């Protein structure tokens, strides 16, 4: 039997957004799906059993890793592997620890990317708002729009999410290029990206946040799609916030669709009144905004898939 610890503290960065001391749906699902091959404990990481072999979670410091002599696998129960986790494993010098992650919400994330793109290209949010007030004039007036059919899009990221986005864009009649890591490894430099995306209409970010992707999409990159559309469904920090805001506010970019943000509420009270950026994106009509819902957090079907994919990894480890 595997000894497994689910790191649950109620922190949105762990597993569920409101993990409880007992009866948590994720814990119950894991016991149902893998209780025959694993024993489970759950709670903050500092309550991890001494003989724990598998940790399910995303936040652990080097000292905890160094002390966990029997730990051989960390399963990150979402798509992106946290940058701090990679740094902690490296600092602990535990080269025997494998990091695994899952893609249970790839379809959901891809769908929100396509929805944001279409809404941004056609000004759907503004049209909706005006018609709710009884205003039909946009139907009869010239209005700014961008047609996707026949235009060119670049998807930054070739993973489970990026590949789904690319297939959907092709179905919309777009010419699509997906970019993974540079051929020689390492990181993309801005001038390299510019040469690949220059003259296109759409840039969609679907990459993990790592040291080499932080701030990757800067003003130079955004200027390569003049009057274009930028969509971000991965991590806000892959973009230079000021560069994006400035180009949206002065019209150098036609529009943006954003599901990820620089400021996330940390309390229930903040959830009711918390601007998502350090700049007032909420004041821009050419920005379509959603509150980090692409991953489907809390949706029963998505959470069930999360548990099933984690259980599948555990079964692989148990063989």
Segments the model singles out, each with a brief description of its role:
Residues 128-164:
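Glycine-rich NAD(P)-binding loop of Rossmann-like domains
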Residues 182-277:
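Rossmann-like adenosine-cofactor binding region
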Residues 64-70, 87-94, 220-227, 247-252, ...:
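Short, conserved loop/helix-junction motifs that constitute active-site signature segments
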Residues 177:
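Conserved beta-strand positions in the Rossmann-like core of class I SAM-dependent methyltransferases
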Residues 40-51, 63-65, 185-200:
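Short acidic low-complexity segments
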Residues 53-132:
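Phosphate/diphosphate ligand-binding glycine-rich loop within oxidoreductases
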Residues 99-112, 126-130, 142, 262-319:
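C-terminal helix-to-coil terminal segments
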Residues 1-54:
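N-terminal glycine-/charge-rich "phosphate-binding" loop or analogous flexible N-terminal tail
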């Amino acid at each position: 039997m595997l000894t497994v610890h689910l790191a649950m503290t109620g922190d949105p960065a762990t597993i569920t957004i409101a993990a409880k001391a007992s009866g948590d749906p994720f814990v119950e699902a894991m016991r149902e799906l893998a209780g025959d091959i694993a024993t489970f404990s759950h709670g903050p990481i500092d309550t991890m059993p001494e003989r724990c072999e598998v940790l399910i979670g995303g936040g652990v410091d080097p000292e905890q890793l160094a002390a966990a002599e029997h730990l051989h696998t960390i399963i990150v129960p979402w798509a992106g592997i946290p940058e701090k986790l990679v740094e902690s494993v490296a600092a602990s010098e535990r080269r025997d620890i494998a990091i695994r992650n899952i893609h249970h919400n790839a379809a959901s994330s891809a769908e929100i990317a396509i929805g944001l793109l279409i809404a941004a290209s056609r000004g759907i949010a503004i049209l909706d708002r005006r018609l709710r007030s009884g205003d039909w004039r946009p139907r009869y007036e010239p209005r700014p729009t961008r047609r996707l059919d026949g235009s060119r899009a670049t998807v930054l990221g070739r993973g489970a999410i990026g590949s789904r986005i690319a297939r959907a864009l092709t179905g919309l009649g777009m010419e699509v290029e997906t970019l993974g890591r540079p051929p020689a490894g390492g990181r993309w430099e801005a001038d390299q990206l510019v040469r690949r995306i220059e003259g296109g209409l759409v840039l969609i970010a679907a990459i993990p946040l790592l040291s080499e992707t932080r701030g990757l999409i800067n003003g130079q990159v955004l200027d390569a799609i003049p009057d274009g559309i930028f969509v971000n469904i991965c991590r806000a920090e892959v973009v230079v916030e000021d560069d994006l805001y400035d180009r949206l506010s002065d019209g150098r970019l036609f529009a943006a669709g954003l599901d990820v943000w620089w400021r996330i509420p940390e309390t229930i009270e903040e959830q009711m009144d918390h601007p998502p950026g350090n700049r007032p994106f909420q004041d821009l009509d050419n920005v379509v905004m959603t509150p980090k819902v692409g991953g489907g957090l809390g949706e029963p079907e998505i959470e069930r898939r999360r548990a099933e994919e984690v259980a599948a990894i555990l079964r692989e480890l148990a063989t």
